[in-house]
């Protein structure tokens, strides 16, 4: 299955498989998957609960390793990297929005958004100012600038989802992976979040979003079924 303009491919997956060993035996979650996604595409990953949507995104994010097959992000074969190089590559090139709203609760919204920019980077005064400015600009673009000094525990589900998007964008990565980003929010919030992803794709970001919600998939360029 392909959603490609042969040039400008951002994500390339070929014959990718992943299984897990459980007390009940081996479970093949992903079997021989192949697809390519071009830069600036907004693609949905669909399938039943437990079908492997989250596993696929986790592998593409470099958080898990496939059993077999190849994966390239922006021309880079991730399996060739050691943990240190992989972490640096991921921080620069991939924004990951997980199902778990994993915030540092004692940090403000602004601090949570800025955090990935400080990982592996300089923290001199000039750099801190630039990062803070970018974080505030992202919060403003997502309509939550007024929440910068709030704490995540005081926010609504929809507001927290926007904070996650801002945090994923802080390093300006070319690829955004979103795992059920509209889970537990109402239809209005779902439409708002999906419009944000659509705009990001139109600006050149490559978006891969796992979802079981037909409403969330309406603005996608295509779907990959697992």
What are these regions (language model features)?
Residues 61:
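Helix-to-loop junction immediately C-terminal to a conserved catalytic motif
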Residues 170-174:
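A short, proline-enriched helix->beta-strand linker immediately N-terminal to the Walker B motif
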Residues 69-77:
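Conserved ABC transporter NBD signature motif
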Residues 77, 118, 126-146:
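Conserved ABC ATPase "signature" region
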Residues 151-155, 159:
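Conserved ABC ATPase signature
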Residues 165:
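Hydrophobic anchor residue at the start of the ABC signature
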Residues 176-179:
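Catalytic Walker B motif of ABC-type/P-loop ATPase nucleotide-binding domains
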């Amino acid at each position: 299955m392909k959603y490609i303009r042969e040039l400008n491919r951002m994500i390339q997956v070929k014959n990718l498989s992943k299984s897990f060993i459980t007390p009940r035996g081996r479970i093949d979650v992903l079997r021989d998957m192949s697809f390519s996604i071009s830069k600036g595409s907004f693609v949905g990953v669909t399938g039943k609960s437990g079908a492997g949507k989250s596993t696929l995104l986790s592998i593409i994010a470099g958080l898990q390793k496939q059993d077999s097959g190849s994966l390239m992000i922006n021309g880079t074969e991730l399996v060739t990297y050691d943990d240190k190089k992989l972490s640096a590559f991921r921080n620069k090139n991939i924004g990951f929005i997980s199902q778990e709203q994993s915030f540092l609760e004692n940090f403000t919204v602004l601090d949570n958004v800025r955090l990935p920019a400080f990982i592996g980077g300089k923290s001199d005064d000039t750099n801190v100012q630039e990062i803070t400015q970018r974080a505030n600009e992202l919060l403003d673009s997502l309509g939550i600038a007024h929440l910068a000094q709030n704490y995540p525990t005081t926010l609504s589900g929809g507001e927290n989802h926007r904070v996650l998007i801002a945090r994923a964008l802080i390093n300006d990565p070319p690829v955004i992976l979103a795992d059920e980003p509209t889970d537990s929010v109402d239809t209005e919030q779902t439409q708002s979040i999906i419009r944000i992803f659509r705009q990001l794709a139109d600006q050149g970001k490559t978006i891969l979003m796992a979802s079981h919600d037909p409403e969330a998939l309406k603005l996608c360029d295509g779907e990959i079924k697992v």
